[in-house]
Amino acid sequence: MGILNSISTPADLKALNDEDLDALAKEIRTFLVDKVAATGGHLGPNLGVVELTIGLHRVFDSPQDPIIFDTSHQSYVHKILTGRAKDFDSLRQKDGLSGYTCRAESEHDWTESSHASAALSYADGLSKAKQLDGDTTHSVVAVVGDGALTGGMCWEALNNIAAGKDRKVVVVVNDNGRSYSPTIGGFAENLAGLRMQPFYDRFMEKGKTSLKSMGWVGERTFEALHAFKEGVKSTVIPTEMFPELGMKYVGPVDGHNQKAVDNALKYAHDYDGPIIVHMVTEKGRGYAPAEQDLDELMHSTGVIDPLTGAPKSASKPGWTSVFSDELVKIGAQNENVVAITAAMAGPTGLSKFEANFPNRFFDVGIAEQHAVTSAAGLALGGKHPVVAIYSTFLNRAFDQLLMDVGMLNQPVTLVLDRSGVTGSDGASHNGVWDMALTSIVPGVQVAAPRDEDSLRELLNEAISIDDGPTVVRFPKGDLPTPIVAIDTLEDGVDVLAYEDATEDDAPSVLIVAVGERATVALEVASRITQHGVNVTVVDPRWIVPIPQSLVALSDDHDLVITIEDGVIHGGVGSLLSDALNASEVDTPRRQIAVPQKYLDHASRSEVFADYGLDADGIETTVVGWLDSLFGE
C-alpha cells in the first residue's frame, strides 16, 4: 500500500504520474476487498468506481467543487481519498465510519441520505446557491448510477439543471451495465425511434467494425444498441436525449482508463454550463468472486472470506425468505395476485415469484411512487397487487398510498421489509416511520407478524381483503423462536402469556407487543412479576385499526404498556391511547418506542440497548413506572 499510504488529501493525487495512478487503483481495490470483507458493506459498486473517483478528485477541487454521490453507497473510494482510510476497520460499526457519505465525518461529504435519485436535485440547488453568491468558478458534480436514473426525481432535476445554461453542473453517469432496463420507460422508446431513422442502418453497418475494434467498451456499445429490442440490459444511454434537454453530452468514456477519465472530466470542468459525462464501468472490477457473481456482482455483502468471497457464516432463513415462499404458494392458488418491485426483486424476496409467474411480475425501476399508483391501476383492473419494498422507501410513495390507493379503496397489499430498526445501514435506512405514516390513511389495515407462522397467516389474510389497502410489515434479520398463543380473542388478538405475582391484590399490567417485539415483551413480563404485578401479554396481529378487544382489556388492567419498534409519535401506543380516550377508559398507559430522532448506525442489538429498548432497558423503565404508580 505504498502509494495509498501517501494519500491523505485529494491534493496528493494531482502530482501522480500514469504508473503511480495505475498502482494506486490496484492498491485501493485490494484495500477495499480486505476491509469490506471484515465488516460487510457495498463492495461491488465501489470496486467499479476506483478510477472514476480518482479522476474526480484529481480534476475538481473538493470541497469547493462539491461532489455528491447519489445514494452514496459507492462513496468508499471517496472516503479513502479524503483522509479516512485509517478508519475503515470501523466501517458500518457503532461509532465508526458510515457506509454512506456523512456530513459529520468530513467537509468533503455534502449529503448523507442513502435514498436514490436525489443527487441531481441537491446539485441543482447547490449550483443555484453558488450563482446567487456570484460564484461562477466552481462546479457542482453529481455522480449518479446503479439504476438511479430510473427514478423520476432525476428527470425532474435534469429538466431544471438544463434550464440553468450558465450554471456549472457536471452530471457523471456511472453506467456499470446493471443500471438500465430497456423494457422500462423512455430509454427503450428513444432508441426504438433512433432505430427507425434512415441513417441508423447505415450507421450501424459502418460502425460495427470500428466499434468492436475499441475493445470491451466498443463491443458493449454495439451489442447494447441491438439489445434493446430483445429486452436485454444495456449500458448505452440514448445520448440524443440530453442535447434535447439543452445539455452537452460527453461519452461513452472507458471508466477504467484513467487518462480517458481525467480528460473527460477536465473537459467537463472547463465547460461553462450543464454537462453530462457518461462513464462505462464494471461493477465488481478486479475481484474475481464479484465478477463471477452474475446476479449481483457482490453489490452488498456480509462478512466474507476475502480470498473466495464466501460468507464467513451460513445465513439462516429470514423473514424475507418466508415471505417469498408464501407468496409463491398464494400466487399458485390465485392467478389474480401480481407482484411489483422497485428495482429490488432479490432483496425483497420477489425473484422466486418472478421465476414462477414472469407475466405477473413487474419491476418498475427505482420508482416507488409509480409502483404504488401502478398497483392501484392493476387493482382497478381486477388484480390484487403485492408491492414489496423496504419500509424506508415507502416514505416516497406516501402520497400515492393516501390518494391513489386509499381514497379509491383499492385492494393493494404493501409488504414492508426492513421495518423498524435496521442497524448498520444507518439513519436513512431505518424503517421506523411506517406505522405512523400508514395509520393515517383512512381504511388501511396494517399487520405486524411476530414470527414465521404469523407472517404466513397474516400475508394470506391481507391478500384476502378486497375492500381496501393492507400493509404487512416485518423487520430485518433472523426469525425469532416461534411463539404459540395460549388464547385468541374474537377479533384475532393473540394472548401470549398470563404471568401472576404471588400477592392476591397485585396490580395488573397489560403489555401490548407489536410484531417481533413479542419476544422481548415475554422476557420483560417474566421479570416484572418479581416486582409484585400480574402481567398479560398480547399480540394484536392487526395493529391498524386498533382491535376493540384491546380497549376492553385495557379497561380491565391497572396499567397498559405498548412495546413497538417504530417512532413514539403516531405508532400503536398513540393509536391505542386515542382509542382509550374515545371510549373514556382512564387506565394509565405508557409507551416503549423508538425516540423521535434519526438513529446512528450500529447493530440492531446495539441500537436497542442504546435507547433502552432491549429487555434490560425496558425492565428498568417499567419498574420505574410501577414504583411511581403503585409503590407505597
UniProtKB/Swiss-Prot annotation:
Cofactor note: Binds 1 Mg(2+) ion per subunit. Binds 1 thiamine pyrophosphate per subunit.
PROSITE patterns assigned to the protein according to its UniProt record, in alphabetical order: TRANSKETOLASE_1, TRANSKETOLASE_2
Catalysis performed (reactions): D-glyceraldehyde 3-phosphate + pyruvate + H(+) = 1-deoxy-D-xylulose 5-phosphate + CO2
A Pfam match: DXP_synthase_N
GO MF annotation terms: 1-deoxy-D-xylulose-5-phosphate synthase activity; magnesium ion binding; thiamine pyrophosphate binding
Keywords from the named record: Isoprene biosynthesis, Magnesium, Metal-binding, Thiamine biosynthesis, Thiamine pyrophosphate, Transferase
Top enzyme category: transferase
GO cellular component, one term: cytosol
Pathways per UniProt: Metabolic intermediate biosynthesis; 1-deoxy-D-xylulose 5-phosphate biosynthesis; 1-deoxy-D-xylulose 5-phosphate from D-glyceraldehyde 3-phosphate and pyruvate: step 1/1
Residues involved in Mg(2+) binding: D146, N176
EC number, as in UniProt: 2.2.1.7
Gene3D superfamilies referenced in this protein's UniProt entry, alphabetically: 3.40.50.920, 3.40.50.970
Cofactor(s) of this protein: Mg(2+); thiamine diphosphate
Gene Ontology biological-process entries: 1-deoxy-D-xylulose 5-phosphate biosynthetic process; isopentenyl diphosphate biosynthetic process, methylerythritol 4-phosphate pathway; terpenoid biosynthetic process; thiamine biosynthetic process
PANTHER family in the cross-refs: 1-D-DEOXYXYLULOSE 5-PHOSPHATE SYNTHASE-RELATED (PTHR43322), 1-DEOXY-D-XYLULOSE-5-PHOSPHATE SYNTHASE, CHLOROPLASTIC (PTHR43322:SF5)
Function: Catalyzes the acyloin condensation reaction between C atoms 2 and 3 of pyruvate and glyceraldehyde 3-phosphate to yield 1-deoxy-D-xylulose-5-phosphate (DXP).
Complex and partners: Homodimer.
HAMAP family assigned: DXP_synth (MF_00315)
Name of the featured protein: 1-deoxy-D-xylulose-5-phosphate synthase
Species per Swiss-Prot/TrEMBL record: Corynebacterium glutamicum (strain R)
Lineage: Bacteria, Bacillati, Actinomycetota, Actinomycetes, Mycobacteriales
